[in-house]
């Protein structure tokens, strides 16, 4: 993550290709199949960055805002086909994401999680399973899930 003027354009292209174009390509295939079968439940994984922007995250936040907007739009389009669309918006989750964004720098990646207990991938997975198992008449349309020490995208209470 870097400022807009200092970031590498190749990073932008990778984020846009992955977080928007890749997301749309998969979503289109899945949506078409669900419309054919007349039912389904699409659960998209967005990010707190899709509803809150922050410094040095402009392009990443923009791609996650796109996921959020597409999820909302698709929910409107799919409801008449009997298809639910939900979005899970995780905050700080201890995954390989930090290692990727810091280009393999393990020390820098682990520093992101110092002084607090982040969410684990299993925490997010449990929410997805819960959402998927709700009765058809219930749609948990959007769910922001944060670590207990996190109140906003970049506001984390650290005990160091």
PLM-predicted stretches and their roles:
Residues 2-4, 8-13:
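Substrate-binding pocket helix/loop in short-chain dehydrogenase/reductase
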């Amino acid at each position: 993550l870097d400022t807009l003027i200092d970031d590498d354009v190749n990073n932008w292209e990778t984020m846009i290709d992955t977080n928007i174009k890749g997301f749309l390509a998969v979503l289109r295939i899945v949506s078409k199949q669900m419309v054919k079968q007349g039912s389904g439940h699409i659960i998209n994984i967005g990010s707190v960055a899709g509803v809150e922007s922050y410094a040095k995250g402009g392009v990443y936040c923009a791609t996650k805002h796109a996921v959020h907007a597409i999820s909302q739009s698709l929910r409107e389009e799919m409801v008449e086909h009997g298809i639910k669309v939900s979005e899970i918006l995780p905050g700080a989750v201890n995954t390989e994401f930090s290692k990727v964004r810091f280009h393999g720098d393990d020390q820098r990646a682990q520093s992101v999680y110092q002084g607090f207990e982040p969410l684990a991938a299993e925490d997010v997975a449990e929410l997805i399973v819960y959402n998927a198992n709700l009765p058809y008449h219930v749609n948990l349309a959007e769910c922001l899930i944060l670590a207990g020490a996190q109140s906003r995208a970049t506001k984390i209470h650290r005990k160091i």
